[in-house]
Amino acid sequence: MISENLGENQTEKIPLKGRTLKELSEIMITLGEKPFRAKQIYHGLYVNRYETWDQFTTFSKIFKEKLEELCSLTHLQVVKQLKSVDGTQKFTFTSESGNGKEFEAVWIPSGDGGRKTICISSQIGCTLNCKFCATAKLEFQGNLKAHEIVDQILQVEKIVGDKATNVVFMGMGEPLHNYFNVIRAASIFHDPDAFNLGAKRITISTSGVVNGIRRFIENKEPYNFAISLNHPDPKGRLQIMDIEEKFSLPELLQAAKDFTRELKRRITFEYVMIPGVNMGFENANKLVKIAKSLDCKINVIPLNTEFFGWRRPTREEIAEFIALLEPAGVPILNRRSPGKDIFGACGMLASKS
């Protein structure tokens, strides 16, 4: 486990951000240090939010010089920051190596100031081609490492001067195609000795990677889970989501049922509303049948990426569709779309300004 993300050659420093406490302990032992040093570093990184070895004032000069030589506190570079009229802020990052690969995170405060969500990315670009998502139009440039995922939170919170109450893996990329690094980062967010976010305040989303869902179930991951459904019919779903070719809707729904049965937790279906594509009575009726078959809630989201040739539904169309879903007897949320003016809303992350 220690060798994960060490770099391409032995001359590169060991990145310490994005490591669990257990991993840090193993690294310290490898470096000939006592395991308790790991807890000091862990606390310094995630509680005190130190960014340089000089800030670890309890460390001896010799120990700090050793860490400086062998280990890295690498952090992301913010190359662009945009603020919406509604208070949403979008951050475009690149890694410290300056490789030019950009990815984004979004700070989303609620209107009353109580809920503060950070939407983070798990990949640069995406491996999938969802027709309603701007990220799908980007070239896939790789998975983000755990320290690059964790540092999105650290950098955003530092800049806005506030702490997030919720974290959602709904930015660029398919989280379950980067399972190891996503779960490692989520465990750090959840750890009481690090970010101390409750498991119910961390949501991992997927477009429907069934083998990843089954791995999630097998590992009994404690986090909230959302599936980007977007169409209640296999043929219709295939037209807008290419993942349907690999993991069919029946397979996906069976995995969702297994999730609720095994983990005893409600699953969330995300549903981007596209007029003429997945709305109307017939689609609503099929979605109601799906919802009745398992313990779930439905988040409906008006289409934001109008530049794909579709239009955003009107308020009347949204209200009518939600009314058609009410017989399902499950919670239905019309999810707001903050940050549209800065291309920070759902489906719009593509390093655009």
Swiss-Prot record:
In this chain, S-adenosyl-L-methionine is annotated as bound at 173-174, 205, 228-230, 304
Q: Matching SUPFAM superfamilies, A to Z?
A: Radical SAM enzymes
Q: Which cysteines are joined by disulfide bonds?
A: 119-346
Residues at the catalytic site: 104, 346
One Pfam short name: RlmN_N
Q: Which parts of the sequence bind [4Fe-4S] cluster? A: 126, 130, 133
**Cofactor note from UniProt?**
Binds 1 [4Fe-4S] cluster. The cluster is coordinated with 3 cysteines and an exchangeable S-adenosyl-L-methionine.
Name the cofactor(s): [4Fe-4S] cluster
Broad class of where this protein is predominantly found: cytoplasm
- Keywords assigned by UniProt, alphabetized: 4Fe-4S, Cytoplasm, Disulfide bond, Iron, Iron-sulfur, Metal-binding, Methyltransferase, rRNA processing, S-adenosyl-L-methionine, Transferase, tRNA processing
Pull one GO CC term from this UniProt entry: cytoplasm
Which GO molecular function annotation, any one, does this entry have? tRNA (adenine(37)-C2)-methyltransferase activity
Where the record annotates domain Radical SAM core, the positions are 112-341
Q: Which GO terms describe its biological process?
A: rRNA base methylation; tRNA methylation
What catalytic activity does the UniProt entry give for this protein? adenosine(2503) in 23S rRNA + 2 reduced [2Fe-2S]-[ferredoxin] + 2 S-adenosyl-L-methionine = 2-methyladenosine(2503) in 23S rRNA + 5'-deoxyadenosine + L-methionine + 2 oxidized [2Fe-2S]-[ferredoxin] + S-adenosyl-L-homocysteine; adenosine(37) in tRNA + 2 reduced [2Fe-2S]-[ferredoxin] + 2 S-adenosyl-L-methionine = 2-methyladenosine(37) in tRNA + 5'-deoxyadenosine + L-methionine + 2 oxidized [2Fe-2S]-[ferredoxin] + S-adenosyl-L-homocysteine
Q: Where in the cell is it found?
A: Cytoplasm
Entry-linked Gene3D superfamilies: 1.10.150.530, Aldolase class I
Q: Which PANTHER family match?
A: 23S RRNA METHYLTRANSFERASE, RADICAL SAM CORE DOMAIN-CONTAINING PROTEIN
Q: In which family does this protein belong, per the annotation?
A: Belongs to the radical SAM superfamily. RlmN family.
Q: What further note is attached to this protein's record?
A: Reaction proceeds by a ping-pong mechanism involving intermediate methylation of a conserved cysteine residue.
What biological function has been recorded for the protein in this entry? Specifically methylates position 2 of adenine 2503 in 23S rRNA and position 2 of adenine 37 in tRNAs.
- Its protein name is Probable dual-specificity RNA methyltransferase RlmN
